[in-house]
């Protein structure tokens, strides 16, 4: 307790985190892209290489997962306006939201129905490509749909993949690995939903369940993989490959906006609100967005009041040297995808200069907004995916933040507020009804 008091003396906002209050923190250390980019340790070239790799795999994905065929084997989601939800939020919170609210529907991505279809699938494909190239079975000029042949399945079956997950990452990696032919084990934390485990098992994935939280599942997965030289561990806490899989979203969103005739520049700022668990997904996406839109995009991470690991780590500068449990927070939240007690040190350090801020919200707030979105727009998401929905009213109410960035009322009126919906497209009907029943 004494240590917590010392921490609060240095970092007063910790008191609100400990009290589980909904908290907003605007990052005083935010810099321009030019200043912040060198600290990421990855470049635009790295993201372009990821983009090219996904293009090589497109013919394979189009055949392996027919639901991606219409998009030519690209796993990408729609961006839709949500005007009725915007009005509902203004009414419920008594706060005008200047500009236009949009929803990025990663919740409905093909194959695994969450943002994790970006990073998780990309890392599995990267590993498969590496093995096949090294074995001389493939060249980068080949049509990758050849990977569907029995010979390749046979080849990949001597290798295995392991990952620790609260659910969605395990789902995307499990489904993709099984399709390629890898043996795959997913180490699931206590928060993982039963339907996600059942779905994995139906794909022939081995699911190992833990009574503990995410950190333990990852640690056990890492240990199990170490004893097998043919086992590749996908490390959600430190993986640069996962991060790059998410980062590809930036250029793709830029292309979608261009198609829609939507302008992003100094006079038309873009605010993006990303739910954050360990940090890989939102970190990678935010990195890609910064590369695509530069200083005209402003990224915010959103976390549950019971799992504010990234806010705690970045705000104190302690990153992965502190966990929410260290300050007496239980890490128990209905937002199972965000139930992480210790943030990725890699992501926190890489992105701390490129984030405009982080905020927390209560589970009940997520349930309420889940219900409103279903009523107003007919879109159904899982609780975690609503974390970003609280962002626009916080930003529009933050006069000091607006002044610091010199936003005029005209600029704010021309703003786009993009809420990144991270999951929910595959939630079973009965489970969704339970979520909807909890909203007020």
Swiss-Prot record:
Protein name: D-serine dehydratase
GO MF assignments: D-serine ammonia-lyase activity; hydro-lyase activity; pyridoxal phosphate binding
Cofactor: pyridoxal 5'-phosphate
Record-listed E.C. numbers: 4.3.1.18
Keyword match Lyase: yes
N6-(pyridoxal phosphate)lysine modified-residue sites: 116
Subunit note: Monomer.
Taxonomic placement: Bacteria, Pseudomonadati, Pseudomonadota, Gammaproteobacteria, Enterobacterales
Species name: Salmonella dublin (strain CT_02021853)
Family: Belongs to the serine/threonine dehydratase family. DsdA subfamily.
Organism superkingdom: Bacteria
Chain segments annotated as transmembrane: none
Record's catalysed reaction(s): D-serine = pyruvate + NH4(+)
Pfam family membership, one: PALP
